[in-house]
Amino acid sequence: MPAPCNCIETNVCICDTGCSGDGCRCGDACKCSGADCKCSGCKVVCKCSGSCECGKGCTGPSTCKCAPGCSCK
């Protein structure tokens, strides 16, 4: 039986404080909203307000690049 936080085995992405870095392996399909994802390899979804789009290499609100006048959350 796979570990519940092993996204690669279970094919379910768990973005939760209940998943520590131990045994938690997320693939590219794992996208979490916010900084609550404790899994290594999880991609954080970057959302920009309005019709703005995030720049490349965005890993979270702190490194989110949006068009001028747009805020990231």
From Swiss-Prot:
Induction: By cadmium. InterPro entries: Metalthion_mollusc. Cd(2+) 4 binds at residues 46, 58, 64, 72. One of its GO terms (molecular function) is metal ion binding. Cd(2+) 3 binds at residues 26, 30, 32, 42. Cd(2+) 1 binds at residues 15, 19, 32, 37. Cd(2+) 6 binds at residues 54, 66, 70, 72. Cd(2+) 5 binds at residues 48, 52, 54, 58. Keywords: Cadmium, Metal-binding, Metal-thiolate cluster. Cd(2+) 2 binds at residues 19, 24, 39, 42. The keyword DNA repair does not apply. Belongs to the metallothionein superfamily. Type 2 family. The metallothioneins are involved in the cellular sequestration of toxic metal ions. Monomer. This is Metallothionein 10-II. It comes from Mytilus edulis.
